[in-house]
Design a protein with these regions (language model features):
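Catalytic cores of nucleic-acid ligases and guanylyltransferases
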Residues: 1-150
């Protein structure tokens, strides 16, 4: 299973920024490579893009499960777009904060604006919606609240 969070404003490479990350339902491993449209009215309905892909390493002592119970995950990402140190801190219920740690991959550049394409197909959200029969106008806005968390 993929433990998953929705980050409505997308990740920030700026260590001064804190981004809301909402814990969502765990996803099957197959979802790591799913792009397409989930019909409106179904869970996660909307256009789904694989925006980044990679691996992670926990940087805390202890297991992933113990870090989840504590509500603090300290990890490094080794993705095509996101790299370096990150921290997720639970603030209550399903609400977490995602923060970039200060390291050589930190930046004030807006990574979601500068790198908007799928890492699998190089399509934009609107292109995925068009190709898969989804709502192109809604996907074209890039509004993260209109994007399924997959």
């Amino acid at each position: 299973m993929l433990v998953s969070w929705a980050v409505p404003k997308g990740p920030s490479l700026d260590p001064k920024e804190k981004r809301l990350a909402m814990a969502v339902e765990d996803h099957p491993l197959d979802y790591a490579r799913f792009e397409g449209v989930i019909p409106a009215g179904e869970y996660g309905g909307g256009t789904v893009m694989v925006w980044d892909i990679g691996t992670y390493d926990l940087e805390d002592d202890g297991s992933f499960d113990s870090a989840m119970r504590r509500g603090r995950l300290v990890f490094a990402l080794h993705g095509r777009k996101l790299k370096g140190g990150w921290t997720l801190v639970r603030t209550g219920g399903r609400k977490w904060l995602l923060m970039k740690r200060k390291d050589r991959s930190a930046s004030t550049a807006d990574v979601t604006t500068n790198k908007p394409r799928s890492v699998l197909t190089r399509r934009l959200l609107a292109g995925i919606a068009r190709d898969e029969g989804g709502d192109v106008a809604r996907a074209a806005t890039g509004d993260p609240s209109s994007i399924a968390t997959g």
